[in-house]
């Protein structure tokens, strides 16, 4: 299922995984200001991303379905402090983060996620959130497989976080849940799933570009 979604989302998926932002991260050449801008916007993104999983709990039809988005939401809420700590290491105070204005790319992407969650099924919501989870897992694998590990890469901690077995497993669980949700769907419903997945992938490209452009 996921292979088909990715294939049908080309060329956008490859542009997402191999974006210039990603390549500069891998080489350690990304300007510090670009990464700081990305980190601040990512915090704002994660707030709305968490809200999307809260909608997933609401959309669930039974306790079994509820468990996956509930677990993800709990992890996100626990780890947001780690994100704030990481931002502090990059010279970004909590006050600066809390007063940062959302970029146009962040608004477009997060409101699209929430719209899918508000108006669509649980499967449609997961079609919207899966490109983020799976994509970051694939980005980390792409970097580790195609670029040498540099001893002084300032972005190595970021790379290691998403290359970790824990994150890779969490991404796979998201994929597996989406696959299960899609099994009973008819061709028309699956076409909508594809459209959402592809659109969210395009939004991810725009988010990387926002970081590069300091937009």
From Swiss-Prot:
Query: Which Gene3D superfamilies does its entry note?
Result: Heme oxygenase-like (1.20.910.10)
* Assigned GO CC terms: cytosol
- One of its Pfam families is TENA_THI-4
CDD domains found in the cross-reference section: TenA_C_ScTHI20-like
Organism source for this protein?
Haemophilus influenzae (strain ATCC 51907 / DSM 11121 / KW20 / Rd)
Q: What is the lineage of its organism?
A: Bacteria, Pseudomonadati, Pseudomonadota, Gammaproteobacteria, Pasteurellales
Q: State the name under which the record lists this protein.
A: Uncharacterized protein HI_0358
**Per its record, what are the GO molecular function terms?**
thiaminase activity
Q: Which cysteines are joined by disulfide bonds?
A: none
Biological processes annotated in GO:
thiamine metabolic process
Similarity-based family: Belongs to the thiaminase-2 family.
